[in-house]
């Protein structure tokens, strides 16, 4: 794949759900790679359009660029793009070859794994960590398979002294999260990822979703510690916790897992006791919550809260999150059980 095509496809696929004009595409490529020229981009886009890989939809005097998923060969082209991205990432990082080789071996025989991607790998590897997201096939043993993958990745983490954070998602959860109006980690991952394993399977999944739904990517990366107080208050109310006498205004919709993580990053004991309430009153995704708590180093606090909640109001999500944190050898920080139970009763969460 030639470099202009790679850069164009990489930029378009990082903005699925947010169609770019040719000017915007040129600017994004320039911001990322240092240079880009409208005339060259336009010429290459026309070539890709003639190959039926892209559609250019005229809107006024500009054209929005979209992937043409009706073309059977597009998936192969996108898989080739992912392989090129992987090659470029690893070219000067030979020390990672043995890690990825062993990771491939550990998942090759796992029929549940559809594809594996790395989130923002260039940034994370500089911090001696890697964030992996696993897309799993539909299975009645989803939680069991998640636990086994966590065990395998923990072994690799210990062997290679490389921090690994796992975001393990079923195909149904993937559908829900990619099309959600809430800000969540999967929508972020789509804009800054390399598919390391099973790129064709990944893009076929995206194709199936995109043909029926609007996929919504997010840029840049969300930092939960910087979620505003007003947005926290608004979202706490959405999930069933409202402080008496406190007014709130419409804010951004964050997923409950991000709201929980943002609160855990604060030192406000009053707000932290809101976490069991919203988790008791609202559904959440155990794998996403475990991933975020590990990524932002708040899993010990979270486990202490979940143990109390599990004692008084056990649910599948709570139990499964505890399972995941325990597999990752998390040591809980105990919370005030009496105070939390009182709050749960006050908010009719029991």
Predicted regions and their residues:
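Short hydrophobic/aromatic beta-strand micro-patches
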Residues: 133-137
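Catalytic core of pol beta-like nucleotidyltransferases
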Residues: 1-111, 121-127, 139-350
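Glycine-rich beta-strand-to-loop/alpha-helix junction loops that act as flexible
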Residues: 114-118
